Amino acid sequence: MQSPIVITGMGTVSPLGCGVKAGWERLLTGHSGISLITRFDTGDLPVKVAGSVPGIDEDPAAGFDPNRVAVAKERRKLELFSLYALAAAEEALTQANWYPTSDADRQATATIVGSGIGGFPTITQAQNTLSTRGHRRLSPFTVPAFLANLAAGNVSIRYGLRGPLGCPVTACAAGLQAIGDGMRLIRNGETDVAIVGGAEACIDPLSLASFHAMKALSTEQEDPASASRPFDRARDGFVMGEGAGILVIETLAHAEARGATPLAILSGYGTSADAHHITAGPEDGRGAAEAMRTALRMARLAPDAINHINAHATSTQVGDRAEIAALRNTFGDALAGIPISATKSATGHLLGAAGGVESIFSALSVMHNRLPPTQNLKDVDQGLDDLDFVSGAARDYPTQHVLCNGFGFGGVNAALIISKI
């Protein structure tokens, strides 16, 4: 019998702060990481709010301090999404106590960190420099800063990890697909340990304006904390977030052999394509349902064995409806008895980093038997009254298996099942 694949380390940078402990505690207590944008002047942009990672000055307890991640000279070469990935990787590797020094261990450690957009702000800044100051003023680090695979590359370089290196660039499913890719590499015997997850940082004027042109973003301004409202009748779009979620995964046998503590089991994974539309999934959610069914088959679980669902739930009208259709397609009548959380209500949508961060939230639910609340769910959308949304406050709940979903543009779907040790 194959040894199960387990999580031995976790690290997060999110709008709820830096570090798994701070982010989890704030999520459970109903803290919102969504606020007015102060990083730049939003001018006449109708989008004024985002899930920004707090800086150390505004959040001394859990703010992001780039000086702790890299010295000033090194930071010139790094886009923000890479800095977030490095910070989250350090936390995860420390918890896992995995700092390989032998050639064999370094070659047996994969680094798979997804990103939907990569260093998009660097591209817009470079274009501005080119237009106003000429090509001679462009930084030689422009290209290596913005390439999406450089989050994975920088983690690999820093820790000398010489195993497989990869970066799913699959929009909002990238983080979950990175985890799935790492699971496959371990199961196929290509690597013993994998550093997996996602990183994203694209809160800038062009990104916001472009997503707004698609009518995808919330335009709430008066009460930023209420802007992300998954499954609520009044939802008006997603809130852009940023951050990174990184996990260390390996087989249980490998973890026990080196004295590591397993935190949770990655018991099932599935991915699929809608083959339908570049930005919208089919109304019946058939592609997403297929990813969930594949994950259930891998985990050898019946649908009613799932105790909790961490929904993708971005707070768009079309997306939330399609996900519920997919869940009904997958779980049938059992869905009414499964509590559902939508953590993007607290963080906004971290795009390619969402799967990394939300898989960690899912693992914590399994570990602590605690379900995070869905914020801002005041008026449940039509046709959803039969479902059990965790709202208002966190819930104590016996949790053996959690399903975590991630879907993205292009019709990509991913589903991950995390189980108790």
Description of each model-found segment:
Residues P46-G55, T122, A201-S228, G270-E290, ...:
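Active-site-adjacent elements of ketosynthase-type condensing enzymes
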Residues P4-T8, S35-L36, P46, E222-A299, ...:
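Condensing-enzyme catalytic core mediating Claisen C-C bond formation in acyl metabolism
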Residues T132-S139, Q177-G180, R184, V193, ...:
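Glycine-/small-residue-rich "gating" segment that lines the acyl/pantetheine channel
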Residues M1-E74, A253-I265, I360-T374, S419-I421:
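ACP-dependent fatty acid/polyketide chain-elongation machinery
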Residues I7, L28-T170, A199-L208, P303-G319:
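Conserved beta-ketoacyl condensing-enzyme motif
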Residues A85-Q95, A148, S156-E200, F238-A260, ...:
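Active-site-proximal alpha-helical scaffold in enzymes
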Residues G9, L27, A89, T111, ...:
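Conserved small-residue
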Residues P15-A22, V69-E90, L138-L147, L165-G180, ...:
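Active-site pocket-shaping loop/turn-to-helix segments
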